[in-house]
């Protein structure tokens, strides 16, 4: 376990997004000090030096030394990250750390100019008039990178990096499946009026919040990939990706935390509603949605804005890039504390619902295994809804050289249970819901019937048109009219003695389908308040049985 100051003392929920970035950035920063990275950096120095001079001019630093100064100087140089101004020999120059993954821009970094007038290197081979010397970026390391250096050796760091990459792939698949399933479920609940009962509207808003979290995470993940492809030395002022856009990046993370809080809040409202319906029977009629709507979206907004205000006040309203490592700050408990409380209360709701359902089965003297399984199954449907997978996400777990394999299993399990939560919720409350399946089957049957009926009507219309065309053509002909009836009898598919009216078999089928639909529909268009969920149906059946 991590101590209170450990950068890994953060929920795996955020590790699923941040762990790979932290480990990969730490790995890249550590690797940037290698000889291979040094040799690769030399290839771009020649073309980067003009840019370095422009940067020095922009910062009011002299790119060239004073020709009247007879002292020995180190020339201005560019180490592919920072541009260093001319510096007198046997002295040093200090600059602010760059905005890069794994580096803290609030720290400073110092570069030494050797007494011989060349930039100091780690050894004599890295010193020369045309060489940039060695920049010791360990001065800029963030707490995460320092933690990695102190607690992970090369082998465990490699494993942690592999775990982070595999977890990212697992999350991509889970987020993609959740995205598709949530869009389908939301579309179904929104399209069919019979499904717009109160309990389904709660499910609908819960899935909307989950969908927004999924979309924001996918956008940030994809942006992180593009940021990495642009290279770690991309000029942050260019704003090519979200990660390099100051206001946009902070806004994305703010809305991510907001919709995460909205998800927790709608989970909590679902728990309150179901607990009151099953345990207390508060609502003889369905409650109004407006108070739930205000609470589900308004309270999280106030909650998230309060957290952001506290963070800004602490930092004197100087916002860090992408809000920095906000998930490591103690102020993050302003968000995580109430979320944890909602999860604990919802777990109590689950246990209480199971207890009530079990007692109702016993009181009804129906102790059959099938009845008990049905009640427990209905209660277990609440598990993904009320956020049990999130409990695993909120338990801090730190990787060290001693528990790296346990950490790998923990990370994979936590990533799977959270990132696939949207898929599980959509499956349980939509795709496997008998009521939804019945509505979809009815819709498909009516669609097939309508399609078949239209084809039959079109075929009938063509036959009637052929009949009249044949009749008119015969009447206008100059040939004798004695065989008109015989010719008509050969051309017409219908008996000449009778015609079917509008109430033929096809029309009757259409009327039956429409009457059946009108019979099942509610007058106000929002479904019946007394419709039974599997949960309520099992509860009421147990109560009414002798």
Swiss-Prot record:
The keyword Cell membrane applies. Residues 473-485 have a biased composition (Polar residues). It is found in: Cell membrane. Expression was observed in the mechanosensory neuron pairs PLM, ALM, FLP, OLQD, and OLQV, the chemosensory neurons PHA, PHB, RMEV, the ring motor neurons RMED, and the pharyngeal interneuron pair I1. Expression in sensory neurons PHA, PQR and URY are responsible for mate searching behavior. Expressed in AIY, RIM, RIA, and other neurons. CDD domains: 7tmB1_PDFR. Keywords: Cell membrane, G-protein coupled receptor, Glycoprotein, Membrane, Receptor, Transducer, Transmembrane, Transmembrane helix. GO terms for cellular component: plasma membrane. Disruption phenotype: Disrupted locomotion (unc); decreased speed, increased number of reversals and loss of mate searching behavior. RNAi-mediated knockdown causes reduced expression of TGFbeta-like daf-7 in ASJ chemosensory neurons. Its main location: membrane. It is a multi-pass membrane protein. Belongs to the G-protein coupled receptor 2 family. G-protein coupled receptor for PDF neuropeptides. Plays a role in responses to environmental signals, including chemicals and touch, and in modulating locomotory behaviors. Capable of transducing signals via an adenylate cyclase acy-1 cAMP-dependent pathway. Required to regulate the sex-specific expression of TGFbeta-like daf-7 in the ASJ chemosensory neurons, perhaps acting via acy-1. Involved in modulating mate searching behavior independent of nutritional status. This is Calcitonin receptor-like protein 1. It comes from Caenorhabditis elegans. The gene is pdfr-1.
């Amino acid at each position: 376990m991590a101590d209170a100051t450990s950068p890994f003392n953060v929920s795996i929920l955020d590790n699923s997004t941040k762990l790979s970035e932290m480990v990969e950035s730490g790995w890249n920063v550590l690797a940037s000090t290698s000889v291979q990275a040094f040799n690769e950096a030399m290839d771009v120095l020649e073309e980067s030096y003009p840019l370095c001079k422009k940067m020095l001019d922009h910062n009011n630093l002299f790119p060239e030394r004073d020709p009247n100064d007879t002292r020995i100087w180190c020339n201005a140089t560019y180490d592919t990250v920072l541009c260093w101004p001319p510096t007198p020999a046997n002295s040093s120059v200090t600059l602010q750390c760059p905005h890069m993954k794994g580096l803290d821009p609030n720290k400073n970094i110092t570069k030494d100019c050797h007494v011989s007038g060349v930039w100091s290197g780690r050894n004599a081979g890295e010193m020369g008039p045309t060489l940039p010397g060695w920049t010791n970026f360990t001065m800029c390391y963030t707490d995460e990178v320092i933690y990695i250096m102190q607690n992970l050796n090369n082998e465990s760091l490699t494993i942690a990096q592999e775990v982070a990459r595999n977890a990212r792939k697992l999350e991509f698949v889970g987020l993609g499946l959740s995205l598709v399933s949530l869009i389908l479920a939301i579309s179904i609940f929104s399209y069919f009026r019979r499904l717009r009962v109160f309990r389904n509207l709660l499910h609908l808003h819960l899935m909307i919040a989950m969908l927004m979290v999924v979309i924001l995470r996918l956008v940030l993940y994809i942006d992180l990939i593009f940021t990495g492809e642009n290279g770690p030395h991309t000029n942050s002022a260019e704003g090519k990706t979200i990660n390099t856009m100051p206001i946009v990046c902070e806004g994305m993370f703010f809305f991510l935390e907001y919709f995460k809080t909205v998800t927790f809040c709608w989970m909590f409202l679902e728990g309150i509603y179901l607990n009151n319906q099953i345990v207390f029977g508060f609502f003889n009629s369905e409650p109004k949605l407006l108070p739930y709507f205000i609470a589900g979206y308004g309270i999280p907004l106030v909650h998230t804005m309060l957290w952001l205000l506290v963070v800004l006040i602490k930092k004197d309203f100087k916002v860090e890039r992408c809000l920095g490592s906000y998930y490591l700050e103690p102020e993050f408990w302003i968000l995580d504390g109430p979320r944890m409380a909602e999860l604990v209360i919802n777990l109590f709701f689950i246990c209480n619902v199971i207890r009530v359902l079990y007692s109702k089965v016993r009181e009804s003297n129906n102790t059959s295994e099938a009845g008990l399984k049905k009640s427990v199954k209905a209660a277990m449907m609440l598990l993904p809804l009320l956020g049990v997978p999130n409990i695993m996400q909120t338990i801090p777990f730190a990787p060290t050289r001693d528990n790296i394999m346990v950490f790998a299993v923990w990370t994979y399990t936590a990533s799977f249970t959270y990132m696939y939560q949207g898929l599980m919720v959509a499956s349980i409350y939509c795709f496997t819901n008998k009521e939804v399946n019945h509505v979809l089957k009815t819709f498909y049957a009516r669609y097939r019937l309508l399609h078949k009926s239209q084809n039959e009507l079109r075929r009938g219309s063509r036959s009637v048109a052929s009949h009249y065309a044949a009749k008119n053509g015969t009447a206008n002909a100059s040939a004798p009219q004695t065989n008109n009836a015989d010719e008509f009898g050969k051309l017409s598919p219908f008996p000449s003695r009778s015609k079917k009216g509008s109430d033929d078999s096809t029309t009757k089928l259409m009327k039956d389908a429409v009457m059946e639909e009108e019979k099942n529909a509610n007058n106000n268009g929002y479904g019946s308040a007394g419709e039974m969920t599997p949960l309520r149906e099992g509860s009421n059946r147990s109560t009414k049985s002798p």
